[in-house]
């Protein structure tokens, strides 16, 4: 199973926020996930991002790959 760390869109129309989720690469964007490791809210004045770095490091150590957007948000 190829695991990917990517964003899932939540919120309502024109007011999105995103969860940072570990999921199987074959699932849809908002499909089932294995674990939620953070969230990102781009709609507030200061864009807030909360990530559980310990779990992020764990998933990277077992071979999960980050999407380009998650790399940019987390600064890794």
UniProtKB/Swiss-Prot annotation:
* MF annotations from Gene Ontology: structural constituent of ribosome
Keywords (alphabetical) are: Ribonucleoprotein, Ribosomal protein
Record carries keyword Membrane: no
This entry carries the following GO cellular component terms, namely: cytoplasm; small ribosomal subunit
Looking up Gene3D superfamilies in the UniProt record yields: 3.30.1320.10
Q: Name one GO biological process term.
A: translation
Question: Sorted alphabetically, which InterPro entries does this protein's record hold?
Answer: Ribosomal_bS16, Ribosomal_bS16_CS, Ribosomal_bS16_dom_sf
Keyword presence, Ribonucleoprotein: yes
Q: Which family does it belong to?
A: Belongs to the bacterial ribosomal protein bS16 family.
Q: Which PANTHER family does the protein's record reference?
A: 30S RIBOSOMAL PROTEIN S16, SMALL RIBOSOMAL SUBUNIT PROTEIN BS16M
Q: Which NCBIfam families match?
A: S16
UniProt protein name: Small ribosomal subunit protein bS16
**Protein species of origin:** Sulfurimonas denitrificans (strain ATCC 33889 / DSM 1251)
Gene name of this polypeptide: rpsP
């Amino acid at each position: 199973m190829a695991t990917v760390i990517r964003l899932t869109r939540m919120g309502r129309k024109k007011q999105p926020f995103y969860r940072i989720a570990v999921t199987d690469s074959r699932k849809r964007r908002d499909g089932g996930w294995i674990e939620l490791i953070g969230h990102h809210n781009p709609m507030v004045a200061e864009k807030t991002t909360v990530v559980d770095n310990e779990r992020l490091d764990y998933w990277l150590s077992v071979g999960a790959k980050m999407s380009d957007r998650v790399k940019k948000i987390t600064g890794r």
